């Protein structure tokens, strides 16, 4: 028996049974290594998300649900809304320190700050850049305050206590003009952005010229920064951010065409290059002769089905709100789909961002509705996202 096995082995070209056994061990080791790689590769992809997602899921659990938001819409006063928020730890420290809208912005900024601190390596540069939105928001608030001739205290109440410029807010508040603000921002990229937009502003005296220049700077960098193709997680985050930019552009152009604005009047307010809507397509949208022409152009784009389903309702009401709501719904559903597809990856992070932004927007709607003349709760609920 032993001789027959030896003969069989040598017939395959092996000099001895030992040589055959050695090769067999090597082959089994290689197969084992392949199995290990196949088994553990997904785990290695998701391992960096273990801690961030634990933190984020805990935060998602604290998001106010629809019932709580509806109850707040039915509250009798702004003070009642504030008292409710004082019962929630994440809001209490801000509600007791700032006016209500400033408190809500601070809570949202804190959420983004958390994401920037805990984001996995491939996502961290994108979330670090997202923190710039608070500097830009504050610069825009100072511009608006100067236009409205608000005093320093009123201006301070508009600012979010976050961002790289947090410690320089006093200098920004003291600026009496756009030129003064540029001087106060010297050494930051925002000084150059405003300086380049200043001639157009001096010509048309429209703050949107300066605000749009800041928005373009932020979103163009964000699209580039998030465009890493490291894995499915980075690609999905990029697609979500890119879609938000595209939706913002579509909304701007829809409003502009509803007001019969021309290409030259619209262009300064549109983010030059979107995600799926490249420059040439945006140009086509802006050059549309009227709303019907614009809707036809949008129908031929990646966002066509969203708009097409609501054209009959628009034709009936002549209100672009139907498109705004449809686009907002598309963005929400996209976040939910990413959550479902990547529950152990970027999904919870994207889901939290979307849910948190909606929560803050709804709370602002309710807070504004409780000021001054009373608005029926039924009308407030219709405004909620």
From Swiss-Prot:
GO terms for molecular function: ATP binding; proton-transporting ATP synthase activity, rotational mechanism; proton-transporting ATPase activity, rotational mechanism. One of its GO terms (cellular component) is plasma membrane. The keyword Oxidoreductase does not apply. SUPFAM superfamilies: V-type ATP synthase subunit C (SSF103486). Pfam families: vATP-synt_AC39. InterPro entries: ATPase_csu/dsu_sf, ATPase_V0-cplx_csu, ATPase_V0-cplx_csu/dsu, V-ATPase_V0D/AC39_subunit, V-type_ATPase_csu/dsu, V-type_ATPase_csu/dsu_dom_3. It is a peripheral membrane protein. GO terms for biological process: proton motive force-driven plasma membrane ATP synthesis. Keywords: ATP synthesis, Cell membrane, Hydrogen ion transport, Ion transport, Membrane, Transport. It is found in: Cell membrane. Component of the A-type ATP synthase that produces ATP from ADP in the presence of a proton gradient across the membrane. Has multiple subunits with at least A(3), B(3), C, D, E, F, H, I and proteolipid K(x). Belongs to the V-ATPase V0D/AC39 subunit family. This is A-type ATP synthase subunit C.
